[in-house]
Structures are given as structure tokens and as C-alpha cells.
Amino acid sequence: MQGTVAGYSLRYWLTLITGLLECLLFAGLVFGHASLVFVLKKEEYFGWLCVDTNSTMDSKDCSGQDEQFSLVFTVASFLNNFLTLLNGYIFDHCGTRMTRLLAIALFSGGTLLVALSSPEFSHLLYPALSLLAVGGVLLLITNMQVGNLFPAHRSTIITFYNGAFDSSSAVLLIVKILYEQGISLHTSFIFLTVCSSIHVARTFLLMPKTHIPYTLPENYTYGTNCGKGNTDTVEETEIKECPPTQESPETENTSLAPEVQSFGSCVKSRFFIFHLVWLSIMQLRHYFFIGTLNSMLNRLADGDSNLVSQYTNAFAITQLCGILCAPWNGLIMDRHKKKPLAPGEADLRSSYLSLLLTALQCLLFSVCTSIAFLPLQYFTFVLQVLNRSFLYGGNAAFLSIAFPACHFGKLYGLVMAVSAGVSVLQYPLVSVVREYPFYVDIGLIFLTLLAFIHPTNVFIHCRKQARLRKEHPETRARL
């Protein structure tokens, strides 16, 4: 029996570590946009949009080229979020294996299209980066459930995976460095396409066919076993629909038989609406920054390509720190786990500090971005990766805390899909920022202030629930 338990533990750890590597090396490639654009400009993708200026023969106006690259990223980031609603539905209803096979097909198609693209077929970048984005986020969605294998550290693992997702953008820095050493863009992306075979093997060996339940049954196992096992039997016991577990964290109903929230009531709750505003505003700030980073660096460096390359490398290197920053947020959200609090209360009490810190980071990041001083951008890069790690890790962790687990895929998909509509605003802002960069930055700073509504609401709710428990101690077990 001891050997069996050790076998389960080993499989859990292998799943955790390989999932972390998968998110770190593949899932968030599309967010290495700045490094990729540097290479694509050298290859003269959309080069026909650069026109000679009247001042000197050697000077060219490439604003049209910059707009095309920004639009490629806008479309990819929009689909990355918007289709997450459909992806969440597929994950909830079709299970892990089918969802991962779809993700691998999309991701492989994206890397293959980049490998087959050329300056003459620059528009292949639109479907290529879109497929990379959608396939990558699907891989992330299927991996976040791994936190259920380690209940005491669930939020930490979820944020850790999201941090790895952010850090994977640095892979395109490696592609950029290899390109400068003589290895072509096409060779690098063919290699990434071949690596998809590793994802297929992990899908069958180290991931469940359906879902990893929360809470975890005793001796739970999954994947392909070498010999007769009870994997199928164990997985058939997983919850197929929402059980009557607990009410909404916002509810004050003292009924003796509380029922789980419906999906509709989750969507209509203040928690969800304010969380959507919180995510949408800060995501727009980050997408706009990434999409315009190359043109901003060119403007601040007065067109010095060596300086632009230096700062692009610095930005990509800081993205590697995402995997180190994200667990801090998870530790904040898990810090009350061992305290004698009511179910769900510990998580909510921890979450408002995480939400507040994330909004504060974004505000400081927006202020630094608005200052037209090139050396300051090193600090801006650090703030950006820290805030982005907190943002996406905190988003997934809060949804898993505040709402029933059986709605996680749909709610995660919905919040990402709606926020995608807001992120489309980055494209018209690109046209405005060329003429009025300072005013756009100031507007985004004031917009960021709206993100503070969400942590304030959660804090007030927790204080209210604490007061109710003091007045009615008999309701503690039901809150």
C-alpha cells in the first residue's frame, strides 16, 4: 500500500513539473511579440509599407509597417481571450484529453504557418499568431487544474503556472538571439512544431481523460498505466455536474440546505462584474504596452537600432522573471489556509490583499510608462512582468476561490472573452498615440484607478461577513 501511495505522489509531481515546463516553454509564445517583431523587421515583413521620407534618402517612414505588426498582435490577443469562452466550455464538457489534443493541433498549426511564412506572404502572420495564442491558452487552461492535486497549495500552483505562461514569451528572445547567430526563423519554428509530439505524450501519460476533481478522492490516479489499474474507475467517479456544496460568497442566506450557485447567478454577482472590470482595464494597459513597445523604443531611442535591440532584449529577459514573481501572489492567497476559518473564508480574506496589490502595481507601471525617459524603461519592464504575473495568476485563483469549481472553465472563458472586447481598443489607441502619446498615457492612468473598485468590494464583503458571524455564531459553518 505504501508503494502505491508513493506511486501516486510521484505521478502527481511529474504532472506538476512537466506542466510547468510546458507552460514555460510553449504556452505564452505570442506575448514575445516584441522580440519577434525585431526579427520580422530584419526579414522585411510588410516591408512595402515603409516609404522614403523627403528629408534624406536613407530615412524611411515605417509607421504603416508598425501598424500592421500591432494589428497582428491585436487580433491574436483578442482571439486569445475571446475564444477562451468556447475553450472553457469545451474543457468543461469534453474533458482534458480532447481539449489538449485540440490545443496541440492549433499550436502546431501556428508554429508551422510562421515557419512557412515569408515577406511575400506576410499576411500569414495573422492566422499563425492567432493559432499560437488560442492553442497556448488552451494548454494553460488544462494545466491549471493540476493545483487540485495539492490542495494546501492550490492558489500558489495556479499562479505559478500563470507566471510560467508569462515567462514563455522569453522563448522568442532565444529565437531572436539564434537568428542573430545565423539560425533562421523558419528553422526555429519547425523545431517548435516537432516539439508538439512531447505535448501529445504528456496528454496520454500524465493527464486525466476528464478532469482532476476538487476535492481529491483517496488514491486518485489518472493517465495510462502499465498494467491493469483502476484509472477508468477512479475517473468515472469525478463530478459531472455541480453538487450542492456552498452558496455564493456574496449571499447572506441562512438556509439550512444551501445549494450551489447556478452559472447565471455567478455571472450576475458583484464579484464577477467587478472582477471583469478589474481584469479588463489592466489587461488593456498591458496589451497596449506590448503591442506598441517596438515603436515606443524607436521613438525614445531616436531610431537607434542597436539601442532598440538592447532594450528589446532587456524586456524579453525580464519576462523570464514572471515564473518567479507569480508564486508570491499565490503565497499571499494561501496564507490563511491553515487557520481555523469557515470554508472559503480564508481564501476570500487573502484575495482582497492580492487584488489590491495588483491594482497598485498597475498604477505605478502606467505612471512609469508615461515618462519619456529611456533608462527608466528598465524599471518599467520589471513592473510590467511583476504586475502581469499577479494579474493573470490572481484572475484564475480568484475565480477558483469565489465560485463553484464546476463553473471554472466557463467563467474563466467568459471573463477572458469579455475582456477581449475591451482589449480591441488598443488598435485605435495606436493611431492616437503617434500624435498624442502623453495624453493617451494619462488617460490610461486614470482608467487604471477603476481597478481599485474590486478589492474594495471584496474587503467590504469580508468585513460584513465577519460582523455577521459575531452577531450570529451559529451561521459560521454555513458561510
Give the positions of each predicted feature.
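Long, low-complexity inter-transmembrane loops of multi-pass membrane transporters
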Residues: 207-273, 277, 288, 292, ...
